[in-house]
A protein has these predicted regions:
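Short, catalytically relevant binding-site loops at active-site mouths
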Residues: 128, 179-183, 225-229, 299
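Extended, solvent-exposed, turn-rich assembly/linker loops in the middle of proteins
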Residues: 132-204
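Alpha-helical scaffold segments that mediate packing/assembly in large oligomeric complexes
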Residues: 93-165, 307-311
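Short helix/loop capping segments that flank catalytic or ligand/cofactor-binding pockets
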Residues: 51-54, 183-186, 296-298
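Structured, hydrophobic secondary-structure cores that serve as assembly/anchoring elements
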Residues: 48, 72-102, 156-186
């Protein structure tokens, strides 16, 4: 397939992600991740040494203790290897009508299916990592049913716990189930906390509309179907594909994490397009795409994740 088709399809997907995904801000900045082939990637970690003692008695330039800067690359493998095939009516890829039809298909797929799967996986993965962190899971995973009387105190209390343990005060983001928005609206006038709704907020360069600000914490509302403690990844062979709630799944009411903690990596790979003259299966055009993705959190940043889960 010509490269310009792959570039166009990727652009369609990127635009839909930016417009509809609650987790697009989790994609790391350029240069943080490099692809090394297939499902393998490397993620950069920058570290420095701390302060030492200054020796005023030395005049040869050695009064300052030598510091070091290390930029190390750690290898990871993208665990999610997904794919899809679309069959379009008989259009020659060179016809002007083909690109219009293909764009509609790709955008609809990205907006309805791909965005939901990515959001669901990323939120669940963060919860899974926090729940598996033995050092903090007893205080960072809070069991509570959010109501008008406790919603603000529960989320604010969890944020304070996470801040103290992570030793980072600023830069946090909350993803809150949309069904709990009413609880915050009803509680907004009866609290000393500063709460506002309908804000436009930029998180890691991605702008979100209708964001709730709870003091200095941006809260993005997410459909409850994307916030589950257990998920099932469907194969697409005998079902509708995608990701759904797993057996005995509980609702995640709120997930808090630092904006630099999640590293969501994805790769639209092996895009193939077969026109009517090449396609031997039916009289039309076939578009096939392989999509690789995962989410990673450096071990030292696990303390910056917390969640409120329904009892």
């Amino acid at each position: 397939m010509a490269f310009d088709y792959a570039k166009a399809y990727q652009q369609f997907i990127d635009e839909e992600f930016a417009a509809a995904s609650a987790t697009a801000w989790m994609i790391p900045e350029a240069g943080k991740v490099r692809f090394t082939g297939g499902r393998d990637i490397e993620i950069s970690t920058l570290s420095t040494t701390g302060l030492g003692n200054y020796d005023a008695g030395k005049a040869d330039g050695s009064a300052y203790p030598q510091g070091t800067v290390t930029n190390s690359w750690k290898s990871y493998t993208l665990s999610m290897d997904r794919g899809v095939k679309f069959s379009l009516d008989r259009y020659d890829p060179n016809d002007s009508g083909f690109m219009v039809t293909a764009e509609k298909v790709i955008r609809e797929f990205a907006r309805i299916a791909l965005v939901k799967e990515q959001d669901t996986y990323r939120i669940h993965r963060l919860y899974e990592l926090a729940n598996g962190d033995a050092a903090h899971n007893t205080t960072h995973i809070v069991s509570a049913a959010l109501t008008k009387t406790n919603a603000i105190a529960t989320v604010s209390g969890l944020l304070q716990t996470v801040r103290d343990d992570a030793e980072e005060m600023d830069g946090y983001v909350a993803l809150i189930s949309h069904k709990h928005k009413t609880a915050f609206l009803e509680a907004a006038n009866g609290t000393y906390h500063d709460i506002s709704f309908g804000n436009a907020v930029s998180i890691n360069g991605v702008t979100y509309e209708n964001v709730m600000m709870l003091d200095d914490l941006p809260c993005v509302f997410v459909p409850q179907s994307r916030m589950k403690t257990v998920i099932t990844v469907q194969s697409g062979d005998s079902d509708q594909g995608g990701i759904v709630a797993g057996e005995n799944a509980k609702d995640i009411a709120c997930l808090i994490t630092h904006c630099e903690t999640p590293l969501a990596v994805s790769k639209l790979d092996a895009i193939k397009q077969f026109g009517p003259q090449e396609n031997q299966l039916f009289d039309g055009t076939s578009i096939q795409a392989r999509y690789l993705y995962d989410l990673f959190v450096p071990g030292k940043r696990l303390a910056s994740i917390g969640a409120v889960v329904a009892p």
